[in-house]
Amino acid sequence: MPILSRKDLERISRRVLFRYLTLSDRKMDRIDPIDFAEKICGLHFAFADMSVTGSILGLTSYSDVDLTISVPRGNGSVQEFHLNGNIAYVDQNLANAGSVGRLNFTLVHEAAHQILGMLYPEEYNPSAQPFICRLADERSTYPITDWVEWQTNVLTAYLLLPRELIDRYMDELGLGRQIKLLNKVFAPKEYALFSEMARRLGVSKTALSIRLDNLGMIGRNDFSNPYAPIHIYADDFDTA
């Protein structure tokens, strides 16, 4: 499979988004995942119970694969997922829980798998990996052990959060070119505006914080640990 850099994936996203804009006849306030997936790769979605633990959020296959996956259930029944490259199954708990951001990320993530499969049909060999599962995590771990998922996550962020929309909402919300401190405890006003930005874009705050960080649009990012500025560590004398 190809090892694509962030710059490679950004170039792909620009081409795909340009194509999407030419197929749409409306002003873009956010990327509509369902419309995007249908227009770009003819992908449709169905909601189902993906796993008992909720650890799997999505399931799809490449375009030239036709298969059925059988998943045993705790009550002795078996649930079947029919995959043909035109459908992606998404865990229905995402919709039931009202988690719009995670739902939208998962929908575009499944479309991103299809896009990479179409661009690199030999490398993304469907006979070697006939189907793809999306796990319940928007963050990429390092060192990277699964390049397929890392590349798909990065491409998803570029597609769902294009620079133009980010710049637009940063300006509209008065955040300027950079959020100096992203911290819900010590910078509540900026954090509230950041949260509103995530709502308008239809993404989770986690996904938005990662994207802004990668763009250099956050000075100090305390999203994951708002009490980081006041952590006090006792020295050996104090603990004696």
Cite the ranges covered by each PLM segment.
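Active-site hotspot residues in diverse enzymes, especially metal/ion-binding acidic/histidine motifs
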Residues: 1-240
